[in-house]
């Protein structure tokens, strides 16, 4: 029996308040309006950005259904939708690509003005919500809200992918892999023979390591205080791994000594102000490029000496690895299907969706790289 045009009742993980566990609830998911798509989720990854909301470091309206790194199958579409149809395998896009705004028209940028990241409203693009629980409307997250058996997204925030794609793997291309990998190949534009440093060896950091390797870097120095992550980093391309706690001097000084004055490219993939500064300082003062990839804590500012940049450093930021999402994500999936890279090493745990809180416990303990929840 078709569910198109009808309210769907299903399970979702609702965050009612910060610093509390998720609650598995019965929710109602309204049908898609014009230019919207309703998706049956198949697999979703647990990303640090979701945890930033739980911890209170990233502020978004509550109660909310989080989740933004996922893959699923189109259940139904609203009026006017032309780029996907029911039955298509898709990845929701936490940064849309409307194709019409100034950013989308600029070939060098991807932070579409239809995004809900900079100043979150917790709605779809028309300003309304599609989730109800216990009679209350529930907010969306980044226009995706994938911690639900069904979700509704705008058409410009979903990408059709290869019908043969294994969704329990390519869900990582929805955020973690593309964000890290693209930060190296698209944003920093790592060059062959160069020296790189990657701060933070979670799923995104390891994907940045993979990007540096793919771009031909000669040295890739992985930096983390958790030595348990070093073997995986080396497996994926790191040439050296260092723990800041093993040194008496600041880690940027250690890196500068190791690299004749500083690395060519550095990546902060943690989201801490102190490591953002260390990452900037460890790149060469005359020709280094440092990229901020980790989401910073809310309402905290950095103050820096302008001389750090005047000498020739470049300091950049990146969302979604610089990929124009609706165009770039299907191409990455095609590359995965062509075996140009593997995602297996990033997925350390697979759990049923109902065990979402266990998945976040694994994240907090540092025992997981990526936990994938299956529906």
From Swiss-Prot:
NAD(+) binds at residues 200-205, 224, 229, 293-295, 370. Its EC number is 1.1.1.105. GO terms for molecular function: alcohol dehydrogenase (NAD+) activity; all-trans-retinol dehydrogenase (NAD+) activity; zinc ion binding. GO terms for biological process: retinoic acid metabolic process; retinoid metabolic process; retinol metabolic process. Coiled coil: none annotated. Its main location: cytoplasm. GO terms for cellular component: ciliary basal body; cilium; cytosol; nucleoplasm; plasma membrane. The keyword Phosphoprotein applies. The modification N-acetylserine is found at residue 2. Its cofactor is Zn(2+). The modification Phosphotyrosine is found at residue 35. Zn(2+) 2 binds at residues 98, 101, 104, 112. Binds 2 Zn(2+) ions per subunit. SUPFAM superfamilies: GroES-like, NAD(P)-binding Rossmann-fold domains. InterPro entries: ADH-like_C (IPR013149), ADH-like_N (IPR013154), ADH_Zn_CS (IPR002328), GroES-like_sf (IPR011032), NAD(P)-bd_dom_sf (IPR036291), PKS_ER (IPR020843). The modification Phosphoserine is found at residue 23. CDD domains: alcohol_DH_class_I_II_IV. It is an enzyme of class 1 (oxidoreductase). Keywords: Acetylation, Cytoplasm, Lipid metabolism, Metal-binding, NAD, Oxidoreductase, Phosphoprotein, Zinc. Zn(2+) 1 binds at residues 47, 68, 175. It is found in: Cytoplasm. It catalyses: all-trans-retinol + NAD(+) = all-trans-retinal + NADH + H(+); all-trans-4-hydroxyretinol + NAD(+) = all-trans-4-hydroxyretinal + NADH + H(+); all-trans-4-oxoretinol + NAD(+) = all-trans-4-oxoretinal + NADH + H(+). Belongs to the zinc-containing alcohol dehydrogenase family. There are 7 different ADH's isozymes in human: three belongs to class-I: alpha, beta, and gamma, one to class-II: pi, one to class-III: chi, one to class-IV: ADH7 and one to class-V: ADH6. Catalyzes the NAD-dependent oxidation of all-trans-retinol and its derivatives such as all-trans-4-hydroxyretinol and may participate in retinoid metabolism. In vitro can also catalyze the NADH-dependent reduction of all-trans-retinal and its derivatives such as all-trans-4-oxoretinal. Catalyzes in the oxidative direction with higher efficiency. Has the same affinity for all-trans-4-hydroxyretinol and all-trans-4-oxoretinal. This is All-trans-retinol dehydrogenase [NAD(+)] ADH1B.
């Amino acid at each position: 029996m078709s569910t198109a045009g009808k309210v769907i009742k299903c399970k979702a993980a609702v965050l009612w308040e910060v610093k509390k566990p998720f609650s598995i609830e019965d929710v109602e998911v309204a049908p898609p309006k014009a230019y919207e798509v309703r998706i049956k989720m198949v697999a979703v990854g647990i990303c640090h950005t979701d945890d930033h909301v739980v911890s209170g470091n990233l502020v978004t309206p509550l109660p909310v259904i989080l989740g933004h790194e996922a893959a699923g199958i189109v259940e139904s579409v609203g009026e006017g939708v032309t780029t996907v149809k029911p039955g298509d395998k898709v990845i929701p896009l936490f940064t849309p690509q409307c194709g019409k705004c100034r950013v989308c028209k600029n070939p060098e940028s991807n932070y579409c003005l239809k995004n809900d990241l900079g100043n979150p409203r917790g709605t779809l693009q028309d300003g309304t919500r599609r989730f109800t629980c216990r009679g209350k409307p529930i907010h969306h997250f980044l226009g995706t809200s994938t911690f639900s058996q069904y979700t509704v997204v705008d058409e410009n925030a979903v990408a059709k992918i290869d019908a043969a794609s294994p969704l329990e793997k390519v869900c990582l291309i929805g955020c973690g892999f593309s964000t890290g990998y693209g930060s190296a190949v698209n944003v920093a534009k790592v060059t062959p023979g160069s020296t790189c440093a990657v701060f933070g060896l979670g799923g995104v950091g390891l994907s940045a390591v993979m990007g540096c390797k793919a771009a031909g870097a000669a040295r890739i120095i992985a930096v983390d205080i958790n030595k348990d992550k070093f073997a995986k980093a080396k497996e994926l391309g790191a040439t050296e791994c260092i723990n800041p706690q093993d040194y008496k001097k600041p880690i940027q000084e250690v890196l500068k000594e190791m690299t004749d004055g500083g690395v060519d490219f550095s990546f902060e993939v943690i989201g801490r102000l102190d490591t953002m500064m260390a990452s900037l300082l460890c790149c060469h003062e005359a020709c280094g490029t440092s990229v901020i990839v980790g989401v910073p804590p809310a309402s905290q500012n950095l103050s820096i000496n302008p001389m750090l940049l005047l000498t020739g450093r470049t300091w950049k930021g990146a969302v979604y690895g610089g990929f124009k999402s609706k165009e770039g994500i299907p191409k990455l999936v095609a590359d995965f299907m062509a075996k140009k890279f593997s995602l297996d090493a990033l997925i350390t745990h697979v759990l049923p969706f109902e065990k979402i809180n266990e998945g976040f416990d694994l994240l907090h303990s540092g025992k997981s790289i990526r936990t994938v929840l299956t529906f």
